[in-house]
Structure formats: C-alpha cells, structure tokens
C-alpha cells in the first residue's frame, strides 16, 4: 500500500507522523511523509521518503483566528494536491491539526484517515469542554456545570464548522465534511476518558514515538535518584522550566543526596550547568530507563513516553492542551501538577513524588494499559479494504 502521511512541523505532530511512517515501512508499505522543511532530513535519515508540505508560511492577517486556520487549510489543500496526485497514494493519513491533508485527499478522491497524536479531543455530550482539565461532573450540580460549560463553548464550535464549510465550498468540495474513514487515537488508554458518544470511527492505537537522535546523554555519577527535565517543544509551553530546575534542585539541599539532573531538549539558549547535571539532546527512550522522575510541560508526547516507561511525573503545564493532559495525569495518580512553577512549589512536588511509591505504581499501571490498543497499520489496511 502506498500511503501519504501529512503533518505540520511541530514536533508533537511531526514526530508521531514519522513514527507511523516507520510502522508502515516495517509492515511492507510505502509511506511518504509531507511535513515542514526542518524535519525532511531527519525523516530521510530514518529511512522514510519525505517531501516539504507546501503553504506552511502564513500569508493572511485575518483577525479571526478560527477563520484564518480554516482558510489556510483550504489554501494548503490546493497547493499540495498536485504533489499528492503525482504520488498517487492508496491512502492519505492527515494529522488532526493539519486539515489540509484530508481536504487534499477529498479533492483527489483518495480515502483518508486522521491521526490524533493525543487523546480524542472532539466535544462530547458526557464531558466538560476539552481543555478545562475538569473531570466529568457528578450529581445534579456537576452535570449542570458541565452542561452550562458545553453551552458556552458550543457557539465557537458551531462557528468553526461554518467557517470550515465556507472554505470547503470555495475550493470545490461539498459544504458538509464527511470526515475521515478512521481516527487513529495515538494515546495510552489510561490517558483517555470514557464518553457516552465515542465515535465509531475512532480507534485507540497507542502512542507513536520517534527519537530524532540515537545519541545517549551521559548521566553524571551519583548514588541518588535521576531527575529528568524535558521542557515543552510547543510554542505554548512554560518558559524557563530548565532554568528553574537547574537553579533550585540541588542534591543534599532540595533533592536527596547523590541526585542527578538531566535536561533533555531539542535546543535552546546556553545554560549554566552544575556538576550534578547534564543538558543536551539525547535519546529519551534510553534516558527513561534510568529515570526516577520526569519534570515536563505536559505535552502528550513526553507524558505518554514517560508513563510507558513506568516513570512518575511532575507536570508544569503551559497553554494549549497541556492543562488538560496535566489534570489527567493527576487524576490517574501518576504525578503532581504545579502552576505557577515557583521554585518552592517545584521542590515540594519533586520531593513528594520521589518519596511516595504510589506515583510510580500508578505510572506502571498506565504503562500496562497499552495491552488493549489496536495496531494502527492494521486499522488503516482494514479501513481501506472496506472502501472496496
């Protein structure tokens, strides 16, 4: 099967797309990744054919962010349709926030599937609005709270649907969006929440992780716990997390004696690194085999990767979906949430998680939930076969 996988350049979306391409290739399929120019060489080094996704640079200044997103997706669909036509894939897999891939597939009459590299974020009649971080309300007052919040957000959701319909018509598609054949929900079941209206096309397939390097960070010597700090790669992530951790987490003072600190990041400004710490880009999968605790911003990729390794968390969420993810971690029991990230709050949360076995036990329970997921490649093959 020849498949085109479309994702924007944000690592939280491009890396899962590369991971899915590798899964396709391992199964004997022929994947081609369309993504930002900054990850083309990385994908090719991993053995994946890759091409630049056209139209990623914004060209309008519409003050309505929602309208701008939909208009940009439609423009990108038209720009990228010729490259997809030349590739002639049997299937297109489009990242959930890169709607252009699905629209381009529709323009060409190619079946398409959506990749959600996080839990399902569609609104539900049984949940508070996604992003609130709230658990479903219980009792009359709790259900009333959720209903009121859903009503307050429904107007924006309906406006988005109207904007999407308008730009679809502009590029020659029907106003009504038929949606994807399947939605690949690439998360751990432990991070999902039950809903009464789970879509029939949505399938849990487990996290999709890709390591952009095979370099191994050398952990400083010591007999105490290893604390990993993984600052967010998202534009909405909390700033200064690494700096606060390096300045205030000190072995024998605010950490157990012999502790080590490892800051794992793709890049950033130079930092003053004490002798008990190391900073750089290294394989997080390898690093997590040594970790006793991870401090991160709450992006789904790092949270899921950490839980898969059975390691507990201290989450310092920024914007976007990080608040939602952080609260799900807390409710699942595998970590603590702090906001704002004051030095005192960070030190207290780190020491509580390190000293209490229940956090690691919950993380291991989350890791075990992977046993119930489906194979994303098989899901794609079976969905395509049903189209005849």
Residue ranges and their predicted role:
Residues 1-9, 15-32, 42-47, 86, ...:
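Nucleotide-activated sugar donor-binding and catalytic core shared by glycosyltransferases
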Residues 32-69:
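Conserved nucleotide-sugar phosphate-binding/catalytic loop shared by glycosyltransferases and other
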Residues 34, 53, 115-116, 186, ...:
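Generic beta-sheet signal
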Residues 35-40, 96-100, 188-192, 263-270:
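Short, polar loop motifs at secondary-structure junctions
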Residues 39-41, 57-60, 119-125, 129, ...:
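Short gly/pro/ser/thr-enriched loop/turn and capping motifs at secondary-structure boundaries
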Residues 71-143, 190-192:
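Conserved nucleotide-sugar donor-interacting segment of glycosyltransferase catalytic cores
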Residues 157-207:
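Long, low-complexity segments enriched in small/aliphatic residues
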Residues 194-269:
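Conserved catalytic-core segment of nucleotide-activated headgroup transferases in glycan assembly
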